[in-house]
């Protein structure tokens, strides 16, 4: 089904996803079948069918499948980064438009087991302004730019919840 003709907001999609059963079906977001399908919902249902999972029947189930799968993939990537980093990773920062998706950010915190700090949503524009501020002498280094941003723009922090359920889903999905 093509959702482009549906008139609905992202808030409605997120609300529908939040109301659905957790971990009903999961996908590998990096699978080649999701690179550029003509119909993403069809690609997801075919993937679930091929992997012996429950097939999403409602729009909210499809959205929840996507969000949960992304959050679990972020965990896998974070584990890889931790194995390469000499420093501990204790917080994940989400910037840009995705920082406005409360459900995905909460799922991400749940899946990775550390706080997620979301914002700013207009990171590209703010970065441009910060470079201009540095050129004008208003900020002298990256630390100064971060302090200025933190004083000027509200950020939202998501604490991990239900981590045992997310750990179990991660083990099944691996």
Stretches with model-predicted labels:
Residues 5-92, 100-124, 130-174:
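Active-site core segments that coordinate phosphate-bearing ligands/cofactors
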């Amino acid at each position: 089904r093509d959702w482009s003709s549906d008139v609905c907001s992202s808030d409605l999609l997120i609300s529908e996803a939040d109301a659905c059963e957790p971990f009903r079906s999961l996908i590998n977001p990096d699978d080649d079948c999701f690179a550029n399908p003509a119909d993403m919902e069809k690609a997801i249902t075919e993937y679930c069918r091929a992997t012996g999972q429950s097939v999403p029947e409602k729009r909210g189930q499809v959205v929840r499948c996507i969000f949960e799968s992304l959050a679990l993939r972020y965990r896998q990537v974070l584990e890889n980064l931790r194995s390469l980093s000499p420093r501990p990773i204790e917080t994940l920062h989400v910037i840009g438009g995705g920082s406005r998706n409360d459900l995905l950010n909460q799922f991400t915190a749940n899946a990775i087991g550390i706080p997620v700090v979301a914002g700013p949503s207009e990171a590209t524009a703010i970065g441009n302004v910060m470079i201009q501020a540095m050129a004008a002498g208003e900020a002298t280094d990256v630390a100064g730019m971060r302090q200025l941003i933190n004083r000027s723009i509200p950020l939202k922090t998501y604490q991990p919840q239900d981590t045992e359920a997310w750990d179990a889903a991660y083990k099944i999905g691996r």
